[in-house]
From Swiss-Prot:
Disulphide linkage map: none
Protein's recorded name: Protein SPMIP7
Tissues showing expression: Testis-specific.
Upper taxonomic lineage: Eukaryota, Metazoa, Chordata, Craniata, Vertebrata
Transmembrane segments: none
Entry's Gene Ontology BP terms: cell differentiation; spermatogenesis
Length: 438
């Protein structure tokens, strides 16, 4: 199968014609062109534009020495290179940048494949296992054979036998299990003779007789004194008691019996959570698992992730109006309402949820006051009335304001300081005028 690969730096493109022309040889690595287009796969660096591979080719680099344990023999005096790699043995270096091999698999809880390759149990480098010898790794576990058609026939036969039986409650019926247990041979092929029960001084076949005595006098009045024999006679199990038990609807009062399972072995054991859940295991692989090595090489993003740049921004955060405001927002361009980079200059007065200032410490401003207030005023009514008992803080602030007072005109020129005593007076003269009577 011919695959056309373009040499564009940073991208890989596979033609659809080569994919659909024939079957894929490797089933585990199918090429899903439509699925790969939906994924946000990072760019693959080619030979021209290397990505993090140049450091392996540097001389005297530990990663280079591990990748090439012995220098090529074509180099002159290759055995004199320093540092010389160690010889082959138990301390032979691993693959480049593979020193931190985890021994345990975080998914299954057993030994990871990297730990098996590092320890080499067959060569002699073994460690004591942390699990029982009966435990088997998931990749080495043999599935339980399914009996198939024979199990289906057996279940149908048992079901037909149960349907033919009378499932109503019968107190006189003796179960087959009880009869087989009495006769023996339930757990052994030989017939077991049950032992005779020993009774001390009494027998089950003993018949009790009661003398019929008169229960009433000759005049027809019942006897007052009770007889113990009558009480003992009434406590015996009689046919009337049996009939009373049969009239009780036990089938409606008692739950149905539980059918025992054929085996106690779990179908799919989970060594991590130790729970049994059939919905967790799916026989059909997901689409993301069928991508192959590209899925393991690059961690993809979720399909539901928002694609940047984001072209929508809430207009209420920029117009400074309350949320869900459906009124008119004035702007230079109407398209800037949905544009995150647009300029919205609202010319209308903004709405505030902050209430107006109220002061209930004064006599005239009691709650429910309906005095006259100007329609443009934001202060409460009669707020200019001074308080009856000024606090010391107000006197202190008043002194500070008097000391920090600054001239309103701030004229410091010589002509501004002149004082004219005739009309028109100097407007900057702030001396008090005195009237003299002749």
């Amino acid at each position: 199968m011919d695959v056309e690969i373009q040499d564009t730096p940073g991208k890989i493109s596979i033609s659809k014609r080569s994919i659909l022309s024939g079957t894929v040889e490797n089933i585990d690595y199918p090429h899903y062109c439509d699925l790969l287009r939906k994924m946000n796969m990072p760019f693959v660096k080619g030979l021209e534009n290397r990505h993090n591979y140049g450091r392996f080719e540097k001389k005297c680099n530990p990663a280079f020495l591990k990748f090439h344990p012995y220098p090529p023999s074509v180099l002159p005096d290759y055995h004199l290179h320093d540092p010389y790699p160690p010889p082959y043995g138990p301390h032979y270096p691993l693959f480049p940048l593979r020193d931190d091999v985890t021994l345990g698999d975080s998914c299954s809880g057993f030994m990871s494949p990297g730990g098996d390759a590092d320890l080499n149990p067959g060569i002699g480098r073994t460690i004591p296992t942390l699990v029982d010898f009966s435990d088997v790794k998931p990749q080495h576990r043999v599935p339980r054979p399914d009996t198939g058609f024979q199990t289906t026939i057996k279940r149908q036969k048992i079901l037909s036998e149960e349907l033919q039986q009378n499932r109503r409650w019968n107190s006189r019926e003796v179960p087959d299990i009880s009869i087989r247990a009495r006769l023996g041979g339930w757990t052994s092929p030989l017939k077991v003779t049950p032992l005779q029960p020993h009774h001390e001084g009494r027998s089950l076949s003993h018949i009790f007789t009661f003398d019929e005595e008169a229960t009433c006098t000759d005049e027809g009045e019942p006897l007052v004194q009770t007889n113990k024999k009558c009480n003992a006679k009434d406590s015996f199990y009689k046919s009337s008691t049996q009939k009373a038990y049969e009239d009780v609807p036990w089938d409606k009062m008692l739950p149905p019996k539980l059918v025992p399972e054929e085996t106690t072995l779990e179908k799919t054991a989970d060594p991590i959570s130790q729970c049994f859940t059939l919905k967790r295991y799916k026989g059909v692989p997901a689409i993301t698992q069928m991508v192959g090595e590209l899925w393991d090489r690059f961690q993809t993003r979720s399909f539901l992730a928002p694609v940047k740049p984001i072209n929508f921004v809430s207009s209420s955060s920029r117009s400074k109006y309350i949320p869900l405001y459906t009124g008119h927002v004035q702007s230079t361009n109407a398209d800037d309402v949905d544009n995150p980079l647009g300029d919205i200059a609202s010319l209308a007065k903004q709405r505030y949820s902050k209430p107006l200032y109220t002061n209930t410490s004064r006599a005239a401003n009691i709650p429910g006051y309906t005095g006259k207030v100007h329609f443009t005023a934001t202060h409460p009514a009669n707020s200019n009335i001074p308080s009856t008992t000024p606090s010391p803080d107000s006197e202190l602030h008043r002194v500070f304001q008097k000391e920090m007072a600054v001239d309103l005109f701030r004229h410091q020129a010589p002509l501004s300081r002149l004082v004219t005593t005739v009309r028109p007076y100097n407007p900057f003269n702030k001396k008090d005028k005195e009237t003299i009577d002749y």
